[in-house]
UniProtKB/Swiss-Prot annotation:
Name of the protein this chain belongs to: Integrator complex subunit 5
Entry's Gene Ontology cellular component terms: cytoplasm; cytosol; INTAC complex; integrator complex; nuclear membrane; nucleoplasm; nucleus
Record region (Disordered): 1-26
Origin species: Mus musculus (Mouse)
Transmembrane segment boundaries: 533-553, 855-875, 929-949
Gene: Ints5
Pfam families: INTS5_C, INTS5_N
Residue numbers bearing the N-acetylserine modification: 2
């Protein structure tokens, strides 16, 4: 009899139920009355109908006292729990506030949450069953766990969809959890099952888990909340069992092949979405079970993602280790790969859990070989379906694993190379499969990108739907730079795939990634072949993205000024832009449209490009100069600030390049400054002024053969302290001031009393040929800037350009301001000779400046070539002439060869005056005999020049414009000075005195007739 009372599978008779907290043991008569009352539902003593509460307690009493009544009592308790759940849902429906269960207010106080009088009964049931489990877990835990789990499944299925407060099973699993865990009856059943599983978890949990999974199969998906909650408490056990159960169900419903049904049945009508994220066919028997697995694992993924990932990867490796798949393999092993693919398709959470380690899992070549062998037995149709699933999964990959997955696929699909490391070779079949996978992926991404808005009919009656996200492309947003770098490697197939992917990414993320990708390509391309990738990308995006080039240009400039773009890439970016713009201007085979648009963008950002000419890295400054030298200027005039900024930066770059690279390195800067001088008169004046000032600056004088203006006097004075510094203070006070009218304190400052003369200056001069080359480069640039634009027909007989008098005047004024600023704006009229006594200091300073900077003579020659510009250098000519007169007067040598510099300066000075039409030809040729004369004779001739200029002052109003030649000339005959007068007589006297040596020169100093003067333009 006791055997009938034992639960199935019990090791031995459990004996009477424990009654530690229950009533005293019943007699046979009392037990008979309780049985009769339980069966009839009527009180045998009082004869009235038992209430639900009394009936339930009667059953609990029998459960304690009569083990054979276990099945009947447990079955009756199902109704008690069902009534309690119904009362709970009814109370929720009376609540006027809708919303999630955790946000709803508690039920009214007059209606108990567990039903009328059943809350205490539910609590007593829990106490009784828990006592049984604690007393004999091996006997009672399997029975009670099966009962409780089956009851929860029935309740979940029964009330799903019948009450508006119960969410649908296909909805949020969290809402179902919150609803049922808020019900006292279902929460009690859950606690009972958890206690059963806890009691057997260390010994034999299979009975409890099997009951859970059996119920899950029967009542899924309404039962998923139970499995999810229990899985959170026992993740290691539940996850493996759920996956195993799902795989078995998948094998049963998908047939022996394992993959055909998983990937779609060809007999079913085609779906608009080839890769559904959730089951779309309610009638398919397989879908509810695999959907339950997806829901359960998705709920557990947030906290137990590592356990799920390990279990999924274990299943994958076990399936590969089991041998080849196909029709001849074990069904569970051959269906594992399709099953895992289907799980990942239906659950983005599971895909994200695995994608992080998927690449590491597939990287060993042995794994790929095993996978290839495993799949080779599958039918072609199933392989195609699995390939389509794999394409969809890659397009849904997100996070950091997406880029790693892309790199893995591309590396695997690359053709074999002779430098492949031994042991890492990929089988050809695997390589071909990856090649096809990438091509299908690009095609699929193209469809997703260009059909993001949905079908044409969507949004007609309402707002348009939001664009569909593509997680794979979203994950690649932060890897545009890496993709561009890989593309520029120009490896076979790889750069074509990644270039196409860059185009899709640019369209998908517009307008952010398109300009960024174009900027990366332009800043990294090192050859025309690599640069063509940028032009091809632009050609593919120009239709889809408006304003692509301005955005790319602005973003790159922003990175340059922010310092995030390294100088080598900045220089390469600017050089590539210059190359594109040059292609457009030359009309060659290059992408002229791209070059023209980049030229427009560059012209709109001149203010941002100008500072790059001052970049500390020379290659960046030179690249910026190359771009600015050929990019078109805006159609409207440049603002004064923009113009001056460009001119200053261009002049600085000119001298910097001249110092570093010599004349060959200033081509771009010269072209830029020439173009700036042609923009407007203000631009011409600014270019000439800054060029002259820069050339005469102490930091650049040595480029043109000048002496470094070192303050050796100050250094020698400061080096040793003096006992008495009164005289030193006076000298400093006067010489440190701004140069003004001279005095006795500063004229002959040759040293310090008690310390001797000034130490001689240490002159470090450049190579003479280099100085000539540098000077010619500067003068050539000035000539190009001063040339009258559009007057090519007015060139001289030798093809020399006609210089603009206004431009030459600007050079002359700048010369005066640079050499002798205190005399700027002085009168142009030539003073008497006695006036030089008041300007001794200034004249000596001017003479010293000409000696230290030979470039001044070349600049005077340039000014003299455009009369009457030399008139504005009158103060310099006067000062230099006075200094030379002083020297020749003090010279005691028998000939002029002992003063080579003064001799050369005297010759150049007279020649320049003659070239500038300040002297008639007869007097202008006197410098030809200076080397044959004595110093006092040279002084006499220079005094005659002074006298002539005193009588015929160098005034611009004395010049007339000759339209035939397009220049100003001076008619000395009209002024009465064509024959030179008494000044020419001095020259003739000197010639007569040296007739034995200078007789052949007499013809050079005869005054020509007036008609000849006009014809010669002097």
């Amino acid at each position: 009899m006791s055997a009938l009372c034992d639960p199935p599978g019990a090791p031995g008779p459990p004996g009477p139920a424990p009654a530690t907290h229950g009533p005293a043991p019943l007699s046979a008569q009392e037990l008979s009355q309780e049985i009769k009352a339980f069966l009839t539902g009527v009180d045998p003593i009082l004869g009235h109908q038992l209430s639900a509460r009394e009936h339930a307690r009667c059953g609990l009493l029998l459960l304690r006292s009569l083990p054979p009544a276990r099945a009947a009592v447990l079955d009756h308790l199902r109704g008690v729990f069902d009534e309690s759940v119904r009362a709970h849902l009814a109370a929720l429906e009376e609540s006027p506030v809708a919303g999630p269960p955790h946000l709803r207010p508690p039920p009214p106080s007059h209606v108990p949450t567990g039903g009328p009088g059943l809350e205490d009964v539910v609590h007593e049931v829990q106490q009784v069953l828990c006592e049984f489990i604690r007393a004999n877990p091996k006997a009672w835990a399997p029975v009670i766990s099966a009962w409780s789990i089956d009851l929860m499944g029935q309740l979940s299925s029964t009330y799903s969809g019948q009450h508006q407060r119960v969410p649908h099973a296909t909805g949020s699993l969290n809402e179902l959890l919150q609803l049922w865990m808020g019900c006292r009856a279902t929460r009690t059943l859950m606690d009972i099952y958890v206690q059963c599983l806890s009691a057997l978890i260390g010994s034999c949990p299979d009975a409890c888990v099997d009951a859970l999974l059996d119920t899950s199969v029967q009542h899924s998906p309404h039962f998923d909340w139970v499995v999810a909650h229990i899985g959170s408490s026992f993740p290691g056990t539940i996850i493996s069992r759920v996956l195993s159960c799902g795989l078995k169900d998948f094998c049963v419903h998908s047939g022996a092949g394992g993959g055909a049904s998983a990937c779609g049945n060809s007999s079913q009508p085609p779906s608009t979405d080839p890769f559904p994220g959730s089951p779309a066919i309610p009638g398919e028997k397989r879908v509810p079970k695999i959907a339950s697995v997806v829901g359960i694992l998705g709920h557990l993924a947030s906290r137990h993602g590592d356990s799920i990932r390990r279990e999924l990867l274990r299943m994958f490796h076990d399936s590969l280790a089991g041998g080849s798949g196909g029709r001849n393999g074990e069904p569970s092993l051959q269906a594992t790969v399709p099953f895992l693919l289907q799980l990942a398709v239906m659950s983005p959470a599971l895909l994200g859990t695995v994608s992080g380690e998927l690449v590491d899992c597939l990287k060993p070549p042995a794994v790929l070989s095993q996978l290839q062998q495993h799949l080779q037995g599958f039918p072609r149709e199933e392989l195609d379906n699995m390939l389509n699933l794999a394409v969809h999964l890659v397009s849904q990959a997100s996070g950091t694993g997406a880029y790693r997955l892309l790199q893995f696929l591309v590396d695997t699909a690359m053709p074999a190379s002779v430098i492949t490391t031994q042991g890492l070779a990929v089988p050809d079949t695997v390589r071909e499969a990856c090649d096809r996978l990438i091509q299908l992926l690009l095609l699929h991404l193209q469809k997703l990108v260009h059909h993001r808005g949905g079908s044409p009919g969507e949004g007609v009656l309402g707002p348009p739907p939001p664009p569909r996200p593509v997680p794979f492309l979203d994950a690649l947003r932060n890897h545009v730079g890496e993709l561009c770098g890989e593309t520029l490697r120009l490896e076979r197939k790889r750069f074509l795939w990644q270039h196409q992917l860059l185009g899709l990414l640019s369209v998908y993320t517009r307008p952010s990634c398109g300009p960024e990708a174009l900027g990366h390509l332009l800043s990294r391309a090192r050859s025309p072949e690599e640069l063509s990738l940028a032009t091809q990308l632009y050609a593919g995006l120009v239709v889809s993205l408006s304003g692509l080039l301005p955005l790319a240009f602005r973003s790159c400039l922003a990175r340059v000024h922010a310092g995030t773009l390294q100088p080598p890439f900045t220089a390469r970016f600017l050089r590539n832009l210059a190359l594109l713009v040059g292609w457009e201007q030359q009309g060659g085979e290059g992408p002229s449209a791209l070059g023209a648009r980049f030229g427009e963008s560059a012209s709109a950002h001149l203010a941002d490009l100008a500072p790059l000419l001052l970049h500390p890295e020379e290659e960046v400054a030179e690249a910026a100069a190359s771009l600015l030298a050929i990019c078109p200027f805006p159609s409207e005039a440049l603002s004064p600030s923009q113009l001056l900024g460009l001119v200053r930066a261009g002049v600085h770059h000119f001298f910097s390049s001249l110092r570093l690279h010599g004349p060959p390195g200033v081509a771009s800067a010269s072209q830029l400054l020439t173009r700036l001088s042609q923009t407007s008169p203000a631009g011409l004046k600014a270019v000439l002024q800054l060029l002259v000032e820069g050339a005469l600056h102490r930091g650049n004088t040595e480029l043109f053969g000048g002496e470094m203006d070192g303050d050796n006097e100050t250094l020698s004075i400061v080096s040793t302290p003096l006992a008495s510094a009164s005289l030193l203070d006076i000298n400093r006070r006067h010489t440190a001031a701004v140069p003004g009218p001279g005095g006795i304190w500063s004229v002959f400052h040759a040293g310090v009393i008690g310390r001797g003369l000034k130490p001689p200056k240490i002159v470090q001069s450049r190579n003479h040929q280099e100085v000539i080359y540098n000077t010619q480069s500067l003068v050539s640039l000035l000539v190009h800037c001063c040339s009258a634009s559009g007057n090519s027909e007015r060139e001289g007989c030798w093809g020399a350009p006609t210089l603009s008098p206004e431009a030459a005047k600007a050079v002359a004024v700048t010369l005066v301001e640079s050499v002798c600023p205190d005399a700027a704006g002085a009168e142009l009229a030539w003073p008497p000779e006695d006036h030089a006594r008041a300007t001794v200091e200034r004249d000596l300073r001017i003479g010293r400046r000409f000696r230290e900077q030979p470039l001044l003579f070349e600049l005077l020659k340039l000014v003299a070539a455009a009369p009457p510009a030399l008139c504005y250098c009158s103060v310099l000519l006067r000062g230099l002439l006075a200094a030379l007169l002083s020297h020749w007067e003090a010279s005691r040598h028998p000939d002029t060869t002992h003063s080579p510099w003064h001799l050369e300066a005297s010759c150049i000075l007279v020649a320049v005056m003659a070239e500038g039409s300040l002297l008639p030809p007869a007097l202008g040729n006197m410098h030809e005999v200076f080397s044959q004369l004595a110093p006092f004779e040279v002084r006499l001739l220079l005094l005659s020049v002074w006298g002539f200029l005193r009588e015929h002052g160098p005034l611009p109003q004395k010049f007339i414009f000759q339209s035939e030649r397009g220049r100003f000339i001076r008619d000395f005959a009209r002024e009465g000075g064509a024959e030179g007068g008494p000044h020419l007589s001095v020259l003739h006297s000197v010639l007569h005195r040296n007739i034995d040596r200078l007789g052949l020169f007499s013809g050079r100093f005869q005054a020509p007739p007036p008609s000849t003067l006009l014809r010669q333009g002097t």
